[in-house]
A protein has these predicted regions:
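Low-complexity, intrinsically disordered or signal/transmembrane-proximal segments
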Residues: 10-13, 18-19
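Hydrophobic alpha-helical signal peptides and transmembrane signal-/tail-anchor segments
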Residues: 22-33
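N-terminal low-structure segments adjacent to metalloprotease catalytic domains
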Residues: 34-282, 436-487
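Eukaryotic short linear interaction motifs
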Residues: 142-145, 273-276, 302-304, 412-414, ...
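Short coil/turn segments at secondary-structure boundaries
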Residues: 146-151, 278-281, 306-311, 397, ...
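Active-site-proximal segment of zinc-dependent metalloprotease catalytic domains
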Residues: 235, 239, 247-386, 392
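Metalloprotease/metallohydrolase-associated module, dominated by Zn2+-dependent proteases
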Residues: 320-380, 396-487
């Protein structure tokens, strides 16, 4: 699906969510182009904490403080004295031109009470079964399907592969296990124990090294043990990659191998994927009721940030995306005049968790261009992996705040969204894990939220030891530290 000339990202909840460095990421020759630390010409002095001026034109209105407070409770009733969450910690969705809420501003909010009563929700239980999260590492490639290695290389960059210039390998599945262990605190997270493998399907063993559709096999196989699932293949409509694999077929394979003790499982795929014939591509999708998700890595390749017409402003990824000057410039494209900073906006921009996040992100210095590319790739993927698993917890797209569970209309919007959960979505996960899985009551849920923040901070701090630190993780760590002061 195409929206406003931007590729769509699919998800398991309507509206769709749009969303790797390839195995042969060029770095030797192109390393000077991949230094991602932005030159901070913009100081991000004033923060955009309310929705943008464009939001009104789009028809989006953030639910008021009472509605947001009520949405956090499983009873659906707001506390007698409503204390609004500080906007400097939990800002509103930006709602910029071509964002998801631009196209679906009336998207129905899902309160904690509505989430609790979702028919498709799989309730967690303290019984020792169906209580684990699984991460399936990227499938290997058999000799018969060796031609598929070429498909993970962005079109136009194979000459670097032929010169033997190999960049960072894909992020290890272990990194995602560590992250999800913190993000879904107190849930056991495991690597799927047996590997999956891409292989040829039937007698179709074409070399398929070109981008021409005639050179592509119609199907390939995804094997696990003695079982093999047929996966459809097509050329990428935008030619970003030589080939795409069908998401629905991959999800069917994932469902068939779901362990008995799994609450949910996510499969990582290095190849570009699509869902329907109308899609340009699809980055992530979850079948929440079936408890499985698939996330591709290819479209998060930072090389694609420079594609004509789809350039990503690396100096305004989250948390810098809340820069008022940046927001004003994007609104001006739609003839929406930016408003001057008010006294209140100036005051709010001097402190708070979002200010701490922007300062921490700006202070980050990568150790090398290789490390920076690898870490950026992982940070982008981590957001989508946690988002898609959120749908397996029956969380719908969030419209209450800027939140990791927001829907996404483009890759540009994807990198502008936060890695944290808003109070409403966090309350749902707290009820599922601290309440249902561990039998806790309201006090235990509040304690769990604090412990989760600590776990995420610990994760962020340890990334430096693994050469996986980035501006997003530093920003999240700064945000968490400031948030916890008020807890």
């Amino acid at each position: 699906m195409n929206r406003g000339g931007l590729p769509s990202v699919q998800d398991n909840q309507p509206p769709s969510r749009q969303q790797s460095l390839s195995l042969f990421l060029l770095l030797s020759f192109f390393s000077f182009r991949l230094v991602l630390t932005p030159t901070m010409a913009c100081k991000h002095t004033i923060l955009q904490l309310n929705s943008s001026p464009f939001a009104e034109l789009a028809g989006y209105e953030q639910p008021d403080a009472a509605a947001r407070a009520a949405a956090e409770t499983t009873s659906g009733r707001a506390p007698k004295s409503v204390k609004d969450r500080p906007i400097g910690t939990f800002p509103a969705p930006l709602v910029l031109p071509h964002d998801e809420l631009n196209y679906d501003p009336d998207s129905s909010p899902q309160s904690a009470k509505e989430w609790l009563n979702e028919e498709c929700r799989n309730k967690l239980s303290s019984a020792p079964r169906m209580n684990k999260l699984y991460v399936v590492q990227v499938p290997g490639i058999s000799f018969k399907a060796d031609f598929m290695r070429h498909w993970v290389v962005p079109s136009g960059y194979d000459e670097v592969k032929s010169e033997g210039k190999v960049g960072p390998s894909p992020p290890s599945a272990d990194h995602f296990v560590d992250y999800l262990t913190a993000f879904y605190h107190d849930m056991p997270v495991r690597l799927f124990p047996t590997p999956l493998t891409w292989t040829s399907w039937g007698s179709n063993t074409k070399s398929a090294k070109g981008c021409r559709s005639a050179a592509l096999p119609k199907y390939i196989g995804l094997s696990h043990g003695d079982h093999c699932t047929r996966i459809r293949v097509r050329p990428a409509p935008d030619t970003a990659f030589p080939a795409q694999l069908n998401l629905d077929d991959i999800l069917d394979a994932t469902i068939s191998i779901l362990p008995d003790d799994a609450y949910a499982m996510v499969l990582l795929v290095d190849h570009d994927i699509y869902e329907s014939e109308d899609d340009d591509f699809c980055c992530g999708r979850a079948y929440g009721g079936s408890r499985v998700a698939v996330v591709q890595t290819a479209r998060y390749n930072p090389i694609l940030d420079e594609r004509k017409g789809e350039e990503i402003d690396r100096s305004h990824m989250w948390p810098w995306s809340h820069c008022k000057t940046f927001v004003g410039e994007l609104c001006a494209v739609e003839d929406v005049k930016a408003t001057p900073a008010t006294k209140k906006e100036k005051e709010l921009s001097k402190g708070g968790a979002m200010k701490a996040a922007t300062q921490a992100a700006t202070a980050y210095k990568p150790t090398s261009s290789v490390q920076e590319v690898q870490a950026l790739w992982f940070s982008r993927l981590a957001r989508t992996v946690s988002h898609e698993l959120g749908h397996c917890f029956a969380l719908d797209h969030c419209v209450y705040y800027a939140c990791n569970m927001q829907g996404t209309g483009s890759m540009k919007e994807d990198v502008r969204q936060p890695p944290y959960l808003c109070p409403v979505c966090e309350a749902k996960v707290a009820h599922a894990i601290a309440g249902e899985l561990h039998g806790g009551r309201e006090e235990e849920k509040r304690d769990w939220i604090k412990q989760r923040c600590e776990a995420l901070r610990h994760f962020c701090k340890r990334l430096g030891d693994k050469d996986m630190d980035s501006s997003m993780w530093q920003g999240l760590n700064g945000w968490l530290q400031e948030r916890m002061v008020a807890m």
